[in-house]
C-alpha cells in the first residue's frame, strides 16, 4: 500500500534537507507540483524563504520553446531560481528513495485565461471566468496534452491530474465578495455551466433554451423566489464526453506511467476534482478528496468502490485540525493515501502524518 505526500518544488529546491525530511515521514511517494495555479504559501522548513507568492499559474518543468505552438504556460519567477525546478526536486526525491508523481493542474490558469479570454468558461449570462480554461476548445485540449507530453518526454515519473475538465463559479478569487447572496449549491452549479462558443456549438439549438432556463432559475433564487428545476442533461453529457476523451488521450501519452485522476462521480461538480461517470473513464486510479468529515469521506469511498474496480486513493489533509487519521478510509475501500501537504505542515502536523503512516502499516 502506497502512502504519499504532496509537495511544492519550492519546498525542495534550495533545501538540501527536504527530501530526507519527507522520506523520514515514512512516505514512499511524493506528488510534486509540476504545473500549478497561483497560490501564496508558507514554507516553514526552507532555509532561504518563508513566504512564497506564486503570482500566476506556472510550469515548473523545463519549457522548450518549440513545443508550444498555441497556448503556453508561464515560467515562475519566485522561490529559489532554477531553470528546471521540477527536475531538480524530482532528482532529490529519487535519490532519497522516493517515487515521484507529477502534479499537473491542466485547465486552471488565470494567466493563460486572461491572455486568451475566448477559450475560457462563460456562464449563462455571457460572463467570463478567466481562471477557467474550457476544454471544449481544441486549443485548451492541446495545451493540456502538451503539458502531459512534455513531462513524459523529459522525466521518468507518474502523473496525477488536477482540473482535468471544467472549473466553475466556485474559485476563491482575490478579495472574494460572493457569500452575501447566500447562493445554494444548485445556483452555484448552474453558474458553473459553460456557454462559451465551443460549448454552444456542441449543444446546438439546445444552448439558448438551457442558458435562458439557467438565468431564470438563478435570478429567481437571487430575488427570493422559487427557481424551477433545470434540465442540463445534454450539457453534462457533453462535458462527460470531453473529459473522457481527454483522459483517454492523456493515458495514451502516459504509456507505462501510472495515471491518477482527481475526480468525483457527481457530473455536476467542477473544479480540481473533475465530475465524471466512473464507468466512462479508465485512469490507473481515482484520487478522491477525503477532506473534512471522515465519516462522510468514508461513505463516499465505499460508494465509489461499489461502482468501479479501479483503485481508489484517499486524498487527506493534515492541515485540517479535526483530521483523525486514515484507518476508516482504508476500511471503506481506499487502497492508497496521499497526504496534503508536506511543505505546508508544521512540526506537529508532520508528526500526525508520520503517525498515520506508521499505524496504517502495522
What residues fall within each predicted segment?
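Active-site clefts of carbohydrate-active enzymes
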Residues: 218-232, 304-324
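The substrate-binding groove and active-site-proximal loops of carbohydrate-active enzymes
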Residues: 3-13, 64-84, 127-142, 232-242, ...
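Substrate-binding cleft of secreted/luminal carbohydrate-active enzymes
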Residues: 283-297, 308, 313-361
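Catalytic domains of carbohydrate-active enzymes, especially glycoside hydrolases
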Residues: 16-47, 52-57, 150-158, 276-288, ...
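Glycine-rich, aromatic-flanked loop segments that form ligand/cofactor-binding clefts
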Residues: 29-56, 82-125, 160-168
